[in-house]
Swiss-Prot record:
<dbReference type="InterPro" id="IPR051612">
    <property type="entry name" value="Teichoic_Acid_Biosynth"/>
</dbReference>
<dbReference type="InterPro" id="IPR029044">
    <property type="entry name" value="Nucleotide-diphossugar_trans"/>
</dbReference>
<keyword id="KW-0777">Teichoic acid biosynthesis</keyword>
<feature type="binding site">
    <location>
        <begin position="624"/>
        <end position="625"/>
    </location>
    <ligand>
        <name>CDP-glycerol</name>
    </ligand>
</feature>
<feature type="binding site">
    <location>
        <begin position="545"/>
        <end position="546"/>
    </location>
    <ligand>
        <name>CDP-glycerol</name>
    </ligand>
</feature>
<dbReference type="InterPro" id="IPR043149">
    <property type="entry name" value="TagF_N"/>
</dbReference>
<keyword id="KW-0961">Cell wall biogenesis/degradation</keyword>
<feature type="binding site">
    <location>
        <begin position="443"/>
        <end position="447"/>
    </location>
    <ligand>
        <name>CDP-glycerol</name>
    </ligand>
</feature>
<dbReference type="Pfam" id="PF04464">
    <property type="entry name" value="Glyphos_transf"/>
</dbReference>
<keyword id="KW-0808">Transferase</keyword>
<dbReference type="InterPro" id="IPR007554">
    <property type="entry name" value="Glycerophosphate_synth"/>
</dbReference>
<protein>
    <recommendedName>
        <fullName>Teichoic acid poly(glycerol phosphate) polymerase</fullName>
        <ecNumber>2.7.8.12</ecNumber>
    </recommendedName>
</protein>
<dbReference type="GO" id="GO:0019350">
    <property type="term" value="P:teichoic acid biosynthetic process"/>
</dbReference>
<dbReference type="GO" id="GO:0071555">
    <property type="term" value="P:cell wall organization"/>
</dbReference>
<feature type="binding site">
    <location>
        <position position="629"/>
    </location>
    <ligand>
        <name>CDP-glycerol</name>
    </ligand>
</feature>
<dbReference type="Pfam" id="PF00535">
    <property type="entry name" value="Glycos_transf_2"/>
</dbReference>
<dbReference type="InterPro" id="IPR043148">
    <property type="entry name" value="TagF_C"/>
</dbReference>
Length: 721
């Protein structure tokens, strides 16, 4: 007979149920029973569950509930079916490490409970237990009983069935989300000895794919969560008889209030107003604990709440933030300029004739913001123009524009005063876009790879899928206008960026005006070639690959390994061609072109990619949006997609049919590519029909007047203010 039962309850968990069950199937010991409860799912969860266990050689107890009643009820139903001496819960959106059950059974030693850590989602998971890292300790219940409560979860705890049955312990079905303490607190009363595991992962939380729809606890709506947390707190206090346990629960509640009503939260005003009555009630209940452990300014806020003076309490809450900023300024800390901005930014600061521009986070003077600025500088010279740069001294801006250094006092002043912001990438969320400011987002390419809300998973440093999507959503909510180059992009932007179509301007990219207006301006083209010191008798190949989400070295910096085989290209093409290498702006590593000085040129830091398009006889790319801009010229394109399987399926995925819709041949190895590059005219003729179709679908909106459209729009807006 097995000693342990694993209980899995699920409701509409189609994104996770397969991974959860696979983690059970992959346990290195199968000496356990399994109970699976379908809590009235209405999606494809049951079908996927059936598929996942169809070849699983285990006698599973299935329970199907007619309607969703919450996981407290589902777990209580499952408890009636447990036939083993011990049991544990595994949430359907979580997974067990393959070594977990083996290790648990080895260490349990017939105690009354085993507590193992719960880790956040990660793709980097160990395959074996590191015995030098893991720590196992046995406790008497009187010593460290609060261990059961630390994660506020009943998952990854092994319970003794006899204790639960003898004392009829059940989950409180009147609670919605924070139901676990109701069960664990009752169970703790009867524990004598237990074992706790430290310092090594055994249980992983599932990844959140859609933070706006997910049922995952940490990502649910705050208003609903906080209300249920408070209800669970009062329920827990009633159940807790041990003074140490009560103190632990009270401390948890105090920390919860401090964290959720932290003055710097962007939605603190809304939170405070919505939950002010609850805060009053909690302050009265917790006043001894809170006042004892708080700083003076926090105590004043608590006392005001106790006296039901919520408006004054909120002012004190915000004064706490003010004090921090003042401290940063007085002590001249590195973020003192930002603190000054937060303290002084207000709508009255806005000056109608001031426009601030930024391109690629201040990297250079380039892209659509450049062309909008140059149009406005020519036709509306009396406005005040400001450009934001990481390194202002390294960027030359024609005309009268002021240059400011990112995160300097002048930078914050510019964003506080400008009536219009123009950027081609996201701006920091700590910049406060006020009601009387207009934010024009030009964006920086027709999308091929999935973006933001359309990405199932995000594999970027310094963030998680839900955090990335929530922050992106906050950013796009500030955009008053988003420029789209075509109908294809408009449809994608609506979904990926949570945009309503009224805010989308389908006018083509301002940066592409030059491709329409100057493609046949030979004098202009010769100037560009001369500036780059290109030989006049050689054709120009441009190689512009994208960055890979998973090849990062740090936040915002990515590596790129040149797979195109320059040596072979040089041998095949060196007599008649030069190649321009244009890395994505997020690529941080410099290219080593030693030995190819007369053949390969790194133009990654050349500010204007449109000028490079104009002098290139053909383009090599992979999954970069440059293909859409270059398509305006109707010249040959080659697609070097050496990692197509990984990129299409494992990373972001594509919006279009990559294998069918491209205006040129696809190569997965460099040698065939090198040979085909010798025959540009042949490729042009062979793919002319696809080149024309590609142009009609993605490039035909670009008419050379997008910069004028935006410049005139800003001018009109200023005149009407």
């Amino acid at each position: 007979m097995n000693k342990l039962t694993i209980i899995v309850t699920y409701y509409n968990a189609e994104e996770y149920i397969t991974g959860c069950l696979e983690s059970i199937k992959q346990q290195r010991t199968q000496d356990f029973n399994l109970i699976i409860v379908n809590d009235g799912s209405t999606d494809q969860s049951k079908k996927l569950m059936d598929e996942a266990i169809k070849d699983y050689d285990k006698n599973i107890r299935f329970i199907d509930l007619d309607e969703n009643s919450g996981h407290a009820h589902a777990r209580n139903i499952a408890l009636e079916e447990v036939e083993t001496p011990y049991f544990m819960f595994l949430d359907a959106d979580d997974e067990l490490a393959s070594y977990a059950i083996t290790f648990y059974l080895e260490k349990f030693n017939n105690t009354d409970g085993l507590i193992a850590p719960i880790h956040s989602f990660t793709t980097q998971r160990p395959q074996f237990v590191d015995l030098d890292r893991v720590r196992v300790e046995y406790f008497n219940a009187k010593e460290n009983i609060n261990s059961f409560l630390r994660k506020q979860s009943a998952c990854n705890i092994i319970f003794r069935t006899a204790i639960v049955r003898a004392h009829h312990i059940r989950f409180n079905e009147n609670l919605n989300t924070y139901v676990d303490w109701s069960f664990v607190l009752e169970y703790m009363k009867y524990v004598n000895k237990f074992v706790r595991i430290f310092n090594f992962p055994f249980y992983f939380r599932g990844e959140v794919y859609d933070p706006f729809e997910t049922l995952t606890l940490s990502e649910q709506n705050f208003d609903i969560l906080f209300k249920d947390y408070v209800n669970s707190f009062y329920d827990a206090i009633k159940r807790a008889t041990n003074p140490k346990v009560r103190e632990f629960i009270v401390t948890k509640m105090g920390n919860k209030i401090a964290n959720e009503f932290e003055p710097t939260r962007y939605d603190i005003n809304e939170r405070y107003q919505t939950h002010k009555d609850t805060l009053v009630e909690l302050s009265k209940f917790l006043h001894v604990h809170l006042v004892k452990n708080q700083k003076l300014i926090n105590k004043i806020e608590t006392i005001l709440l106790m006296n039901n003076e919520t408006d004054k309490a909120f002012k004190v809450n915000q004064f706490r933030k003010t004090l921090r900023h003042v401290k940063n300024i007085v002590l001249r800390r590195k973020n003192k300029e930002r603190s000054l901005y937060d303290l002084t930014d207000k709508e009255d600061n806005v000056k109608p004739k001031t426009i601030v521009f930024e391109s690629f986070g201040g990297k250079n003077y380039s892209d659509s913001p450049k062309y909008i600025y140059e149009y406005m500088q020519k036709y509306y010279p009396n406005y005040r123009y400001i450009w934001s740069f990481k390194n202002p001294d390294k960027n030359v801006v024609p005309g009268s524009a002021e240059k400011v250094k990112r995160n300097s006092a002048e930078y914050y002043q510019a964003y506080s005063e400008a009536s219009h912001w123009v950027s081609n990438a996201r701006t920091p969320l700590y910049l406060n876009k006020k009601e009387n400011q207009t934010y024009i987002q030009t964006w920086h390419g027709t999308p091929l790879k999935r973006l933001a809300n359309d990405m199932k998973v995000v594999r970027m440093p310094g963030t998680t899928t839900p955090k990335y999507k929530r922050n992106f959503n906050r950013e796009t909510s500030r955009w008053d206008y988003l420029i789209s180059p075509n109908r294809y992009s408009t449809e994608i932007f609506r979904s990926a960026f949570w945009m309503d179509e009224e805010r989308i301007l389908e006018i083509g990219y301002p940066r592409n005006d030059v491709l329409v207006n100057r493609a046949n301006d030979q004098e202009y083209l010769d100037e560009i070639r001369t500036h780059l010191n290109l030989p006049s008798d050689k054709k120009v190949i441009m190689y512009a690959p994208t960055w890979r989400d998973d090849e990062f070295v740090s936040k915002g910096k990515y590596l790129f390994e040149l797979k195109i085989d320059l040596d072979n290209l040089y041998k095949e093409l060196g007599d008649d061609y030069v190649i321009l290498l244009r890395m994505h702006y997020l690529i941080s590593n410099a290219l080593d072109l030693s030995g190819y000085e007369n053949f390969a040129i790194d133009v990654s830091n050349y500010n204007d990619v449109s000028e490079l398009f104009l002098i290139s006889d053909c383009l090599i790319t992979d999954y970069s949006s440059v293909m859409f801009d270059y398509g305006i010229l109707k010249r040959p394109q080659f697609f070097f997609a050496y990692d197509i399987d990984k990129y299409d399926k494992g990373l972001r995925g594509f919006y279009m049919n990559y294998m069918e819709d491209l205006p040129g041949p696809i190569y997965t190895e460099p040698y065939g590519l090198a040979k085909e590059l010798k025959n540009l005219d042949k490729v042009q003729q062979q793919y002319q029909e696809k080149i024309d179709a590609f142009y009609d679908r993605f490039c035909s909106v670009d008419n050379g007047k997008a910069s004028q459209y935006i410049g005139d729009l800003i001018h009109k807006d200023i005149k009407e203010q």
